[in-house]
């Protein structure tokens, strides 16, 4: 006989992997972050030509991270990966002011994609240990983040080589995923309960009303 959990949200933590897309321009540090999370060490990388995919566990969630190549000629191939995406990690080189407009343009395109509608957005501002990186307020303005109204977003500064900021950003994203799943689970249970009550009400026979005469 199986064991039944009394926690109504226990299904949230089942083993089914949650798909996250890790996107951004080439050289922004996506692959370095991926393998820092996967191996807890910094590995030498070259620009990704297609994609890397790894699954990690964080806050009881199985997260499958898809690190897609960021070269301009390859970005047009991102779209087939959008299906069933739960959240987006957009990686920006905070030391590269020459390409920040290009990064902002790519992010704006992503925000218009129907398949990514509602996906929480985590921005990793990498290379904060470089000389004169963009601070978070400047980066927020440059990326036009205040114009994003249809989803939750968060900017996390990182120093990947030291592992600073990566897990904090993933904490935020995991918390939002859990909150979303709890909300969907509650709405589903509430809808089912109301439907059951309605069906029960409809199945009851109509009882004829008795005429009651008032005594005067």
From Swiss-Prot:
A Gene Ontology biological process term: intracellular protein transport
Which stretches does the entry tag as region Disordered? 188-216
InterPro entries in the record, alphabetically?
Answer: P-loop_NTPase, Small_GTP-bd, Small_GTPase_ARF, Small_GTPase_ARF/SAR
Ranges of Low complexity composition bias in the record: 188-204
UniProt keywords (A-Z) are:
Golgi apparatus, GTP-binding, Nucleotide-binding, Protein transport, Transport
Q: Where is the composition biased (Polar residues)?
A: 205-216
| GO cellular component terms given for this protein | cytoplasm; Golgi apparatus
Which Pfam families is this protein grouped with? Arf (PF00025)
Task: Note the SS bond partners.
Answer: none
Molecular function, one GO term:
GTP binding
Localization per Swiss-Prot or TrEMBL: Golgi apparatus
Q: Which domain of life is it from?
A: Eukaryota
The job of this chain, per UniProt, is described as: GTP-binding protein involved in protein trafficking; may modulate vesicle budding and uncoating within the Golgi apparatus.
Q: Which family does it belong to?
A: Belongs to the small GTPase superfamily. Arf family.
User: What name appears for this protein in its UniProt entry?
Assistant: ADP-ribosylation factor D
Q: What is the lineage of its organism?
A: Eukaryota, Amoebozoa, Evosea, Eumycetozoa, Dictyostelia
């Amino acid at each position: 006989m199986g064991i039944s959990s009394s926690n109504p949200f226990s299904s949230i933590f089942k083993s089914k992997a949650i798909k996250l897309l890790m996107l951004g321009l080439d050289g922004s540090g996506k692959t370095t972050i991926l393998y820092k999370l996967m191996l807890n060490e910094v590995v030498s990388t070259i620009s990704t030509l297609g994609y890397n995919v790894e699954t990690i566990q964080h806050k009881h969630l199985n997260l499958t991270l898809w690190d897609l190549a960021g070269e301009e000629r390859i970005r047009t191939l991102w779209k087939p990966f959008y299906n069933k995406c739960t959240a987006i990690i957009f990686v920006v080189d905070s030391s590269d002011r020459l390409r920040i407009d290009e990064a902002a343009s790519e992010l704006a395109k992503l925000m218009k994609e129907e398949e990514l509608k509602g996906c929480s957005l985590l921005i990793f501002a990498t290379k904060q240990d470089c000389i004169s990186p963009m601070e978070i307020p400047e980066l927020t303005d440059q990326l036009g983040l205040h114009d994003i109204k249809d989803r939750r977003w968060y900017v996390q500064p990182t120093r990947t080589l030291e592992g600073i900021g990566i897990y904090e950003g993933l904490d935020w994203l995991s918390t939002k995923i859990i909150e979303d799943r709890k909300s969907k689970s509650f709405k589903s249970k509430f809808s089912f309960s109301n439907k059951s009550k309605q069906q029960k009400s409809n199945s009851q026979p109509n009882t004829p009303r008795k005429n009651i005469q008032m005594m005067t």
